């Protein structure tokens, strides 16, 4: 039955692509669909730098940097540093795939900030390790636990050493907030290096999550492994690239591609720049590990903000010196925190966010945008004036 349905979908797509009745028209493929993040940054006239950072456990992460804007390059003085951390199944391109006047990475650079963008282990740009290869199961034995424990400290410490600054502003979206809550509550030395935490579409517990991803999360672990294997989950691939450049550029199917994004996150289709859908879909999804998805599955099933459950008391004892996974306590995080949430966000549900707000010890700002869903924070047409300007104002206030 599944194969018949898939065949029907493929036939429908092919018929639409070749149909004279629908015009069979393709819009021009955006050149950014075939660019890496550094090339996208340069394409828009910004300076671009790229660095490789090794974590304590041997993963090699890619950091992208926009050291200054297009107009303030003559200012040689030190600039306040901002670190942008993407969400689940995403990469650093999230911050630069809209137009230059509507992408947070570019807006911050033009506003006088030194902008750095992280890439979590296992995504398109962070698929290397000191001793392991992506073909080995061991490479993929990680979840957002390790991203918080190893990736964030390695990235932030590298940035501070490179810039000579003592603190950074941290902006996280989705899972980028999750690993921030973990790292800044568990590692006090790292928390002291965060001037302010900007949490966009924050996710800690997902007890009320209504995304179809939550339905997947309720499947037994063994069934998820049967479906997706033990290694990577939804990496960027040649097939996805083809879909982005041949299907998502079609005048009829472009809207379908946009709606597939909304299917997981909530609907606000009028706030998406449909001319950029091919750029979005050729960079996202950017992949993660199946184990990371299992961790999110556990968060849905157990309704707790806790470390990965290794499946037995013995294995948990080996990893944690206790028979059950330790719980993460957001209240232990003392970093000044500003939160933005969306009323139509299916991943960072309103009820989950309201619970989270009571746990943030140093909450300095919160705004809920009623009609926003999970992707509006990074791609929303109105994000520059509804969110990004406010972020910059808060950064300057707490400078």
From Swiss-Prot:
Q: Name one GO molecular function term.
A: lipase activity
Ranges that cross the membrane? none
Q: In which tissues is it expressed?
A: Most abundantly expressed in brain, lung, kidney and mammary gland, a moderate expression seen in placenta and expressed at low levels in the liver and heart.
**Main localization category:** other
The record's account of how the chain is modified after translation: Glycosylation is not essential for catalytic activity.
Q: What is the effect of changing residue 76 to R?
A: No effect on enzyme activity
Glycosylation sites per record: 36, 72, 101, 161, 273, 321
Gene Ontology CC entries for this record: cytosol; fibrillar center; intracellular membrane-bounded organelle; lysosomal lumen; lysosome; nucleoplasm
InterPro entries registered for this protein in UniProt: AB_hydrolase_1 (IPR000073), AB_hydrolase_fold (IPR029058), Lipase_euk (IPR025483)
Q: Name the chemical reaction catalysed here.
A: a sterol ester + H2O = a sterol + a fatty acid + H(+); cholesteryl (9Z-octadecenoate) + H2O = cholesterol + (9Z)-octadecenoate + H(+); a triacylglycerol + H2O = a 1,2-diacylglycerol + a fatty acid + H(+); 1,2-di-(9Z-octadecenoyl)-glycerol + (9Z)-octadecenoate + H(+) = 1,2,3-tri-(9Z-octadecenoyl)-glycerol + H2O
- Active site per the UniProt annotation: 174 (charge relay system), 374 (charge relay system)
Propeptide stretches in the record: 28-76
Could you provide one GO biological process annotation from this protein's UniProt record? cholesterol efflux
The free-text function statement in the UniProt record for this protein reads: Catalyzes the deacylation of cholesteryl ester core lipids of endocytosed low density lipoproteins to generate free fatty acids and cholesterol. Hydrolyzes triglycerides (1,2,3-triacylglycerol) and diglycerides (such as 1,2-diacylglycerol and 1,3-diacylglycerol) with preference for the acyl moieties at the sn-1 or sn-3 positions.
Name the associated disease, please: Cholesteryl ester storage disease: An autosomal recessive, mild form of lysosomal acid lipase deficiency characterized by accumulation of cholesteryl esters and triglycerides primarily in the liver. The clinical presentation is highly variable depending on residual levels of lysosomal acid lipase activity, and ranges from early onset of severe cirrhosis to later onset of more slowly progressive hepatic disease with survival into adulthood. Age at onset varies from childhood to adulthood.
Q: Which family does it belong to?
A: Belongs to the AB hydrolase superfamily. Lipase family.
Classification via PANTHER family? LYSOSOMAL ACID LIPASE-RELATED
Q: Mind telling me what this protein is named?
A: Lysosomal acid lipase/cholesteryl ester hydrolase
